[in-house]
Design a protein with these regions (language model features):
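N-terminal beta-loop-helix "entrance" segment that forms/cooperates
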Residues: 26-48, 103-106, 159-165, 295-300
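Short, polar loop motifs at secondary-structure junctions
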Residues: 27-35, 94-99, 133-136, 153-157, ...
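Anionic-ligand binding region
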Residues: 129-173
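A structural signal for small-residue-enriched, beta-sheet-centric alpha/beta enzyme cores
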Residues: 254-257, 440, 446, 451-599, ...
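Generic N-terminal targeting/processing segments that precede catalytic cores or assembly contacts
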Residues: 250-412, 417-434, 438
Length: 631
């Protein structure tokens, strides 16, 4: 059993993550003002001290604690550390993602006392504190001797707490969700603002940018240090992976890593190796920042290649080494599971090269390419140049970003010499023969195409069960509409189309469109929107309700017939016959016929899907690669 301490955005994410398991857990908040939806979770309210938490854990067989409270909830953090030590229960600290500290534009303060001292020293008379109502008492020396305004949440408990701390209500202003941060600053004209280092989800970046644009000084209190006894994560994927590690039976299937994430980890390890001038022992795992911004730890294989340099007679040389990660796809039946993902780093140099400080650069020159076992693009339509490595933009940028972050962490100066990262998959060429890659024009190896960095475990039964759980949660929100889409990419576009719907109202169907609609019908969902991209739409329009490539492939003749009916020329029909991927249709169909073709495609999809939702209203949206929506 798991007990979450929340009350924050991170608490909500923790709920959503654990709900995927379909098992009971507990969610505790100090007050009752956070509105959260729990389907499998049980809500607890009211503060608990260490003894009360220990007693609860013993009575309810709690094996794992999740601290998803605010970064500045120091009393709770300390209490959970005490409980962890005395009860031998691990604590996962769900941290926020924090931007790099801006030393140029922000005056950083160690704590509240340091903030008071620095603000008073600067003789700031008009101050806007965006530090929450609980800090009013801590900052009393400031508002006793200057004009201070506090922005707080618009609720009775906050007003009561402000009064109890002796603060004048006329200097209180209330947070309005969605309001531009500049509005209040323009109204009050403060000389400075005071912030807490509350992270990206706490709106820290928006507050800083608003103040900078208005020329207002910025003071920020550094977040408290996290206990070294906690296991730290800062996102949903990392949280799930740690839960899977400590409670292997909690989730029905174990998540895994994409090839791109493995490649990024190997590239980071190789970067560490090549600059390890003091020959320290290499860590057993390295951090990788995923496309969603969170960081996870990825195990790497023991070091077998010592960095070396080769020098030719003409003065050209090369620093070079490599590192390996064994791909772990979790419980997903991934054909590449268990394969080696190797990253080689090579940095060319000349003996007479100028020093980096003599040739300052704006950024590192990092080049990513494929080696042994990584396919080469031989046909158009995949969004990559002919002859280039089959590494999509997302994993390519993830590799570059993580290498860059590690170079900065090692204080390596930016220099004009390129840093070449070559990704190899030994055995990839043979494995690729058992995939659709050759048919798509990817020759000589596998493709690295992941978009999230994480492999969600897939089996028909387990995935359909997860759809059912998600649908039950979505219905419980009482959302006026439930939106189903294939995955993260299409969901991102369709969320912008329905900005007011709760997060839980969006359900992933993967490839199981038919099963998802049947579940929606069983749950008596009145309004369903189906978001679909071209690749699945052309299969669905033909009546294939399971769109997995192993079950059904794109029927070019069917698409040509549809295109002919919508007025496309013989030249266009011939181009359709030569395409490799359905998404090429966005470029093949003439722009003036796209809407007509899209409507015809949607109509066919609706004809096959509507009978599965006999008592509900079905809306189908066709989504382009760039997020444009046809209805």
């Amino acid at each position: 059993m798991i007990l979450i301490f929340g009350g924050t955005t991170e608490g909500r994410i923790a709920i959503q993550t654990l709900e995927e398991a379909g098992k009971t857990f507990y969610y505790s908040t100090k007050g009752d003002e956070q509105d959260v939806l729990l389907h499998n979770g049980i809500r607890l309210q009211g503060a608990m001290d260490a003894i009360e938490i220990e007693t609860f854990c013993a009575q309810h067989h709690i094996k794992l604690l999740i601290d998803a409270a605010h970064p500045f909830a120091t009393q709770l953090h300390e209490t959970l550390e005490q409980v962890s030590v005395e009860s031998n229960i691990p604590v996962i600290r769900f941290e926020r993602i924090f931007p790099k500290r801006d030393e140029e534009h922000i005056t950083w303060c160690r704590d509240y006392d340091d903030a008071i001292e620095k603000i008073q020293k600067e003789k700031i008379f008009i101050l806007l504190a965006l530090t929450c109502v609980q800090t009013i008492g801590k900052l009393k020396p400031l508002w006793q001797n200057a004009c201070c305004y506090f922005r707080i949440l618009d609720r009775d408990s906050s007003r009561k707490l402000a009064r109890e701390q002796g603060f004048s209500e006329k200097n209180l202003y209330y947070y309005t969700p969605g309001e531009d941060e500049q509005v209040l600053m323009k109204q009050l004209h403060p000389e400075a603002i005071l912030l807490k280092e509350s992270g990206i989800s706490g709106g820290f970046c928006e507050k800083v940018e608003a103040a900078r644009q208005l020329g207002i000084r910025i003071f920020a209190i550094c977040r408290p240090k996290t206990s070294g006894k906690f296991i730290c994560v800062n996102g949903e994927h990392g949280l799930r992976r740690i839960v899977e590690k400590h409670l292997p039976d909690f989730f029905p299937l174990r998540s895994g890593l994409t090839t791109g994430t493995c490649a990024a980890a190997a590239a980071v390890a190789a970067t560490w190796d090549v600059f390890n001038i003091y020959f320290k022992k290499r860590p057993t795992e390295f951090p990788v920042v995923l496309p969603n911004g969170e960081t996870i730890q990825v195990p790497v294989e023991p070091q077998h290649h010592i960095p070396h340099s080769d020098l030719l007679e003409n003065g050209d040389g090369m620093f070079e080494t490599s590192a390996t990660v064994i791909k772990d796809a979790g419980d997903d039946p991934d054909i590449t599971n268990g394969m080696k993902v190797v990253a080689n780093i090579a940095i060319p140099f000349r003996i007479d090269d100028p020093l980096p400080e003599d040739t300052p650069q704006d950024d590192y020159n990092i080049i990513v390419c494929g080696g042994e076992g990584v396919g080469v693009i031989t046909m158009p339509g995949l969004g990559l140049e002919l002859g280039s490595s089959a590494i999509n933009d997302t994993p390519r940028e993830m590799i570059k970003k993580n290498v860059k972050l590690w170079l900065e962490r090692l204080h390596i100066a930016k220099q004009p010499n390129p840093i070449l990262i070559t990704i190899s998959i030994p055995g990839g060429e043979e494995i690729a023969k058992r995939t659709f890659n050759p048919r798509l024009g990817i020759e000589g190896g596998i493709s690295i195409i992941g978009t999230s960095g994480i492999v969600k475990p897939f089996s028909s039964e387990a995935f359909i069960n997860s759809i059912r759980k998600s649908m039950e949660v979505a219905k419980a929100t009482q959302s006026p509409r439930i939106v189903i889409s294939s995955g993260a990419k299409s969901e991102r576009f369709i969320k912008a189309y329905y900005p007011d719907l709760p997060t839980q109202a969006f359900v992933h169907y993967g490839n199981f469109i038919g099963e998802t609609l049947k579940i929606a019908a069983e749950e008596q969902v009145p309004h369903v929107t189906l978001g679909v991209m071209m690749g699945k739409a052309v299969k669905l329009a033909e009546g294939n309700l399971d769109t997995h490539s192993k079950k059904v492939t794109m029927n070019k003749e069917f698409i040509q017939d549809l295109a002919r009916q919508t007025g496309c020329s013989e030249e266009t029909l011939a181009a359709i016959g030569q395409m490799n991927l359905a998404r090429e249709l966005w470029d093949i169909i003439p722009e003036e016929l796209l809407e007509k073709f899209g409507k015809a495609l949607i109509e066919l999809c609706h004809r096959h899907c509507a009978p599965l939702l006999p008592n509900g209203e079905l809306t189908i949206l066709l989504i382009t690669e760039n997020g444009k929506i046809y209805s």
